[in-house]
């Protein structure tokens, strides 16, 4: 059984980011390492939703590059994607499902 591990501090950062970005969706890259069936989140890289949308999110190519460079510098990898659904249930939308196929890491939807 696989699981995701993150600290309360990182969880609080994600919740705060989601609240601050309302009414739009928020998003972040989750950096860490996978050991056996455990995805350990060591760093949350908060990103801007360039769509400025309540129903979609896009992370800019520049921010994606910054996130990957930070992961490399810290000897980590992308282990998850976070985004919020401020006006709907926290279940994957059809768009989410499509992009999950391109990014086969755990997705956390809040």
Placement of each model-derived feature along the sequence:
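Short, well-ordered beta-to-alpha junction loops that form the rim of enzyme active sites
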Residues: 84
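Conserved beta-strand-loop surface patch within small alpha/beta domains used
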Residues: 1-78, 87-110
